[in-house]
């Protein structure tokens, strides 16, 4: 059986996505998609690339994701799905690229600097 692979990263999260022709079953780390992301409204955003190319019920997705929090994992899955779809059909790139699904979000947490409380928060300044 043919399958298509895409890797997605976001913050500290890394998602490995395998798409196979099927009926729309999505499994994340061995659990059902809704079970893994239960109660998170944002989770549906991970499946947006499939909606964009009208392929929502046409593929089964087997996803392993590790690292980061749930939000970063959702965005990592989104990128992985988009890349796997382009592997399946290179013509999808024209639809997915303008919507930003093939762009890796490079924003990561800024490091804490010495002499500061956080990355930018400085100790309170007293004039006198």
From Swiss-Prot:
Gene this protein is translated from: rpsI
GO molecular function, one term: structural constituent of ribosome
Transmembrane annotation, as ranges: none
Pfam families registered for this protein in UniProt: Ribosomal_S9 (PF00380)
PANTHER family xref list: RIBOSOMAL PROTEIN S9, SMALL RIBOSOMAL SUBUNIT PROTEIN US9M
Family note: Belongs to the universal ribosomal protein uS9 family.
Keywords assigned by UniProt, alphabetized: Ribonucleoprotein, Ribosomal protein, RNA-binding, rRNA-binding, tRNA-binding
Summary of the function given for this chain in its UniProt record: Part of the top of the head of the 30S subunit. The C-terminal region penetrates the head emerging in the P-site where it contacts tRNA.
Quaternary assembly: Part of the 30S ribosomal subunit. Contacts proteins S7 and S10.
Keyword match Ribosomal protein: yes
Matches recorded under InterPro entries: Ribosomal_Su5_D2-typ_SF, Ribosomal_uS9, Ribosomal_uS9_bac/plastid, Ribosomal_uS9_CS, Ribsml_uS5_D2-typ_fold_subgr
GO cellular component, one term: cytosolic small ribosomal subunit
Keyword rRNA-binding: yes
Protein name: Small ribosomal subunit protein uS9
BP-aspect Gene Ontology terms: translation
Classification via SUPFAM superfamilies: Ribosomal protein S5 domain 2-like
Organism of this sequence: Thermus thermophilus (strain ATCC 27634 / DSM 579 / HB8)
């Amino acid at each position: 059986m043919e399958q298509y692979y895409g890797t997605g990263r976001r913050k500290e999260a890394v998602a490995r996505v395998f798409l196979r022709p099927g009926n729309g079953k999505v499994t994340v780390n061995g659990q059902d998609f809704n079970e893994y992301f239960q109660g998170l409204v944002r989770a549906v955003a991970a499946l947006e690339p499939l909606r964009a190319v009208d392929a929502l019920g046409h593929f089964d997705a087997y996803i392993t994701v590790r690292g980061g929090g749930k939000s970063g994992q959702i965005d990592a899955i989104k990128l992985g799905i988009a890349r796997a779809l382009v592997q399946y059909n290179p013509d999808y790139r024209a639809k997915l690229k303008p919507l930003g699904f093939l762009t890796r979000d490079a924003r990561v947490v800024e490091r804490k600097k010495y002499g500061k409380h956080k990355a930018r928060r400085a100790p309170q300044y007293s004039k006198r």
